[in-house]
Amino acid sequence: MIKINCNSFNPFKTNLNQDKTVKILESALHGADDGELFFERRKSESFLLQDNKLKNSNYSSSQGFGLRVVKEEKTGYAHSNEISETSIRRAAETSIRAAKGKGGKSDLATSPVKTDKILYSNNNPINEFSFSYKVDLLQEINSFARELDNRVAQVSINLASSIQEISILRLDTPLLNDSRPMIRLSVS
């Protein structure tokens, strides 16, 4: 049985039964050289302040999975935006058909060595501050830019933040998780 590491995005806590999913993956990878089940959730937001006004704000969220089966020189891949046992079962069937090669037993490739380098904090930049705080920050930056020089006629500020959370299920390792928060601020 594979142990689950703590992660804010964990499809086994919300969408799936872990034991059933492992069985589907075992079936999909039977006789394969390599493969995995990759889960992903993305959230992003952006703000545009122009001409002293909030011109645009957007928010989007998506999630899904991909299942990869490698057999000799062939790779079968299937994906879906719906994280469910039914979707994973269909993806497994598709991946197996796509990667089907000559019969015979093969061993799965070993997972890459885990580096455990923490490159980012676990903070979600979207949830870290309120909508009004972000708008106030943009207005403060706008005022600062205009005060730098009286020749400044127009200021455009774009604030974009996102978080990508992934979980990778392989048969030879515990569930692998990563969180990638990003923030971009541009002023022109």
Residue ranges and their predicted role:
Residues 52-54, 59, 113, 131, ...:
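Short capping/connector residues at structural and topological boundaries
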Residues 71-82, 139-154, 188:
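Hydrophobic transmembrane alpha-helix bundles
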Residues 45-100:
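N-terminal alpha-helical targeting/anchoring segments
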